[in-house]
C-alpha cells in the first residue's frame, strides 16, 4: 500500500521506502524544504522540529503537535500532514507573524536554530487555540521553547518574541525591538506588532488526507518491512508469523533511538500506535488505565483532567512535564519508556512515579494477557523479549480514609542540570504516605503506610526502598526515626560501578527523604497536607516555588550622528532565517551523483595502525572508497590545517598520536551510509615498543614536551615581584587552580561540499570562519596551485572559534574525495564525531603566590601556568598573551609569570570565544576571592581597592590604555552599583541567609578589562546599473551581525553623496557570500573586531566611490535646478564609464590597532543545599560599547556571550577518559544553557561613551568581552557556598568564618553539593537529636 502524506499542503505518495528512513532524511533529500536541520540526531536541540497534524474522523477534529523529524520514522506519518517553518510563511507568500516578530525582536543571530524555535512557538499557539480552556500565557510562552537550544542569543530576545503572543503579557516588559520606540504608548505598541489572527495564520489540514482510509501501510524494502496492525490479535499474528531469526521493533515515536542510537537494522518494524487497546485511556473510580502506546503528553493531559479527584495525579503530571522536552513527550510513549527502563536500564522518571503509586502493568504473552506489579515487571528475568508485549498501565486512585486525622501525602523530586529542559536526572524520587495525627498528649504524626521510590541513581532500574518503608510503617516520626531511616536508605541506594557522582546521588536520596518527612516532625501534630494546598512552610526546607517569569530590561542609546550607523536595524536575513529559507552549506542542492563522507578516527592515544577494515570483513552498504594518507596525490602533502604556528595533518600516517585523530575518510552514496560505515570500521592497533602517551600537563613537564612561544605572544612582567612580596603583610603561597575545557556547540556541525571542476580545479563550499586558510590548505594537500581552488562561504551556523582551524580538515577531506573520485563529496559531521574532534577550550593548571596588605591591597603576584594544547600547536602559542591581558585588570603591584604551552597526546585545543581571556579574567577573580577569604574581608571591598587608577592602568597596559577619558571602568563600577541596587541587595542577601538553613544566596560584582586588536580586512563595494549595491568583505557572517553592520556602513558612506532618496539606500544594499577567488586576504573571522574592521574597509571603498561620483553630481546640480535622484546619478555615471567598483585592504595603524574594553557584572544566585542546584535570580550588566554601530546587534552579542559564559562556569562538562577520548558526545550528557537556566531577571545596559578617534566611528567590540562577566555568577555561587559552609561548621560548634575552598569550573550541581556538604542532612539530624 502506498505511503501518503502532505508536506506544507503538498501531496507525497511513496510506494517503497526503507522503514529506517526518518522524516528528516526524507524532507532534506526529497523536498525543497530545508528549514528542518540536523543539529543532534537525538531529539535534544529542536533544530529539526516540524508540526505533525492528524485527522480524527470520528471526532472530525485535527490534532497538532510538534515532533522531532530526526527521530520520527517516515512510515509513521502515513495519512498525516507535516508543516515546516517554510509552510508557515516564506518570501513568496509572505512571512508569518511569528517570523516577523522573531526578526523584529532581534531573536535570530546565526539562524540555524530559528526555524525550530518558530515551529515550537507555532505549535504552542495552535494547541492553545484548539484547547478552548487554555490561554496562551506568558508561562506557556516561556515553556514553548524550553526544549530548543540556541548558542547565540542568550534566549532573552527569543522569549520576548514568544511572549509578545501571550494573552497576559505586559507589553512594556518586552525588550528592544524594531516595532516601537521607547516611551510610546501601549496602544501604539500593540498596533505596531505584526498582527496575529489564529483564523488567518493557522495551517489548514489538506482535504485529500481526510478521505484517506486507515489501512496497513505495509512497506517492503529489500529485506526490511513495515507493518501496521489495528488490533492486539493482528499484532500477535504478525509476531507469530515472523521468522525465528527475524529482529522485530515495535514503534510508536521511535524516540528511544535518540538515546541508544541503534546501529542494527531490524527485519520488521511494527507500528503499534493504531491499536485501540494500546492507545486507550480509561478512567473510573478505581483509577486510570493508560495504554502502552499512549504518548507521554497525552498521559499528562489525562492525569491533569483527573487532578480534581486526586492531587496525586496532578503531581504526577507536573513531574512528567519535566521529562525530555515537549516534542519528545509528544512522540514518546508510556510503554516505550517502561520497556527501555526494564530491558535497557534507561533512567526513567515514569517508572519511579508509577512505583510510588503501586501501579500494575498488563502484558501480552503469546495469546494470554498477564497482570503483574510494576516492580515485578522491572525485575523480569530474562528481560522482556520480542514475544512479550506491554499492553497498558493501571494507576490506582489514592484517597485518604474518612476523618480529619488521616491524610495521604504525595511528592515527587527530580535533580537535573536543567529544571524543565532536556536533561536526565542525577536522581529522581516519588513518595506516597498515609499519615495520621496522634492524640494531643503524644503530639506527633505516625506513618501508617508508605511507598518510597527512587530511580536514575545508577542502578539497574527504579526501585522501592522496601526496608525503609517497613521500618517507617507504624512509627511516630521523630529526628531519631528519620535519622535511622536515612541510614537504612544509604545501604539501599547503591549506584553501579561506573556511575558518575555516585556519592552525590546517594546524598540526593537522603535529602529528598528528609525534605518529605522533616516538615511533619517540625509541624508537631499538624499534618502537612498537599491535598489541601497547605504545605508547611518553614525556614529549614523551603517549599518548591513555581518559577517566576523571566524579566529583563535593556538600556541602549541609538545615535543619529552617522545615520543609519548607530540605529538598531534588524539583522540582515532575519526573517529568511526564521522561515528556514536561509541557505547553509548542507542546504545546497546537490547532484544525484554526490557522494558523502564520514571520518574514521582513532580510539588510542599513541599506537601503530596495523590494519583498517570493517566488521566481518564485509564492505558496508553504499561504500565507494576509504581514503587515507596514502590517497593524497603524490605532488600533495598530508595537511589538514594550518596556522601561523605550523600545519596539522589531515590523516594519521602509520602512527596515530591521539584519540580522536582522523585515520580515514569513508565515502558512500548517502550520509547515512557513510556514518554507518564509519561506525562499523575496525582499526587494529599495536602499542609495542612505543613510549607511554603524554595525557596530562604533569606528564608534559616530566618529559619537557612544550610548544615554543614567540616573544611577541609572551608579555613582559610588570614591576618588581621580589620587592612586592617583601612589602606584603600577608601571603598566600602555592595555591592551585584548575580550569577545564568547553565545547563550542555551534548549532550547525562542521560541514563542507566539494565539487570537481574542469582543468584540475575544485570548488568547495565550507562552513568556515577562515575560507582563505581552507583555500590554501586544500591547494597544498592536493598539490595544485591556489588559483585552481575556490572556496565559498555564505553563512555559518555558529562558530565561536570552532569553525576556524577545525573547519579546515573537513573541507580538505571533501576536496580530496572530489579530486580523487571526480564526483561531488559532501560531509556533515554527526554531533558525536564533531564533539570528539572539536578540541574545545584549553584546560589549564595554575599555581600562584600572592602578596597583599591587611587592608586587601595587593602588592605582588607570581603565576606558574601549564596549558594543555594537545597534539598540534593550532593557535595555542597565543594563549600566554591572551591570558595575561584580562588578568591584569587589577593592580597587582607587581606581576610575574611562567607560562608553558604543553604538547600532549590529546586532540589539539583551539580558540574558543574569548580564548585565554575568560580564563585569565577568572584566575584574577579566584585570587581576589581567596585574598578576601584569608583576610575575612568583604570581597567586593577587596576588588574595589585594587581597581586600577589611570596611572596603574598605563603601568600594566602601556599605550593600549589610551587616553584618560577612555578609561571608563571606575564610572561603570559606580554606575552599576546604583542601577543594580548592589548595596541594598547585599544586605537583603545577608538577611535571607540568616533566616534560611537549606537555601543560601550570594551576590557578586565583577569587573572586566578585555584587550582586542583590529586586523587587516579587505572590502569591495560595487554599484550596479539600477542603483543597487553589492558588497563583499573578508569577514564571515557567523551570526554576529557582520553583514548588518556592513550594510549600515555602506549606506552611511554612500550617503555622503547628497541625493534624493538616499534615506532608502539601506534597502538597496546586499552583502554577498565570501569567495576566495573574488576577495583575497580574508584571514580569520575572530577576535571580536572583524565586524568593525570590515565596516572600515567598506567605508574606505565608499570614500573612493563618492570621490568619483561627486564631480558628476556637482555638474548635474549646475545643469538642472532641484535635487538629483540616486538612480539618475548612477545612470549618468554608467554613461560616462565611471568605475563604480572600489576595493581596498583596510590596515589599522599599529599604534592604535589594540584597545581595551570595559564592563561590570552583578549576579545574585540561590543555592539549594539539598541538591546543589544554583538558580540565577538576577544578573545586571553594564558594558562600554563606544559608539555602537548597531545597538540591537551589540546587545545580542552581549547577552549571548554572557549566557555562553554561564555554560562554561556553571554547567558544561567537557572531559576526556583515560585515553584522552572525549567522554561527552551529545545533548544527553553535554548541557548548554537553556531558557530555564538563564537569569530570571536579566538587565543589560550598553553604554555609548565619548568619541574614540582611533576607533571605527568611535565603536568598540562586543562579541567576546561580555562572556568574561559570567564569572559574576560563579563568584556569587562561591559566596552562597561560603555561607552554607559557615552555617554547617557553626552548627557543629566550629568557627567557619575562614573556611577556605576552591570552587571548580564548571560549578555543576554535584560540585556545589559536595562543597556544601554531602552529609549535611545526617549532621543536621544528629545535631537535632543531641539538642533534644
UniProtKB/Swiss-Prot annotation:
Q: Which PROSITE patterns match?
A: 2FE2S_FER_1 (PS00197), 2FE2S_FER_2 (PS51085), FAD_PCMH (PS51387)
Say what happens when this gene is deleted.
Impaired abscisic acid (ABA) biosynthesis.
> What is the predominant subcellular site recorded for this chain?
cytoplasm
Question: What catalytic activity is recorded?
Answer: 2-cis-(+)-abscisic aldehyde + O2 + H2O = 2-cis-(+)-abscisate + H2O2 + H(+); 1-naphthaldehyde + O2 + H2O = 1-naphthoate + H2O2 + H(+); indole-3-acetaldehyde + O2 + H2O = (indol-3-yl)acetate + H2O2 + H(+)
Give the cofactor binding note.
Answer: Binds 2 [2Fe-2S] clusters.
Q: Where in the cell is it found?
A: Cytoplasm
In the record, biological process GO terms are: abscisic acid biosynthetic process; auxin biosynthetic process
The GO cellular component terms are: cytoplasm
| This enzyme's EC code(s) | 1.2.3.14, 1.2.3.7
Alphabetic keyword roster: 2Fe-2S, Abscisic acid biosynthesis, Auxin biosynthesis, Cytoplasm, FAD, Flavoprotein, Iron, Iron-sulfur, Metal-binding, Molybdenum, NAD, Oxidoreductase
Cited InterPro entries: 2Fe-2S-bd (IPR002888), 2Fe-2S-bd_dom_sf (IPR036884), 2Fe-2S_ferredoxin-like_sf (IPR036010), 2Fe-2S_ferredoxin-type (IPR001041), 2Fe2S_fd_BS (IPR006058), Ald_Oxase/Xan_DH_a/b (IPR000674), Ald_Oxase/Xan_DH_a/b_sf (IPR036856), Ald_Oxase/xanthine_DH-like (IPR016208)
Tissue specificity = Expressed in vascular tissues of all organs, particularly in phloem companion cells and xylem parenchymatic cells. Highly expressed in roots and rosettes, and to lower extent in seedlings, stems and flowers. Expressed at very low levels in siliques and dry seeds. Also detected in root dividing cells (tips and primordia), in mesophyll cells and inside the guard cells.
Cofactor(s) recorded for this entry are: [2Fe-2S] cluster; FAD; Mo-molybdopterin
Q: Where is the 2Fe-2S ferredoxin-type domain?
A: 1-88
Please give the SMART domains that the UniProt record associates with this protein: Ald_Xan_dh_C, CO_deh_flav_C
Binding locations of [2Fe-2S] cluster:
40, 45, 48
Domain (FAD-binding PCMH-type) spans 219-400
User: Has the keyword Acyltransferase been applied to this entry?
Assistant: no
Q: What else is known?
A: In vitro, cannot discriminate between (+) and (-) enantiomers of abscisic acid and leads respectively to (+) and (-) cis-ABA.
Q: How does it assemble?
A: Aldehyde oxidases (AO) are homodimers and heterodimers of AO subunits. AO-delta is a AAO3 homodimer. AAO3 also forms a dimer with AAO2. Interacts with PUB44, and this interaction probably results in targeting of this protein to the proteasome.
- Kindly provide the name given to this protein in its UniProt entry: Abscisic-aldehyde oxidase
Name of the coding gene: AAO3
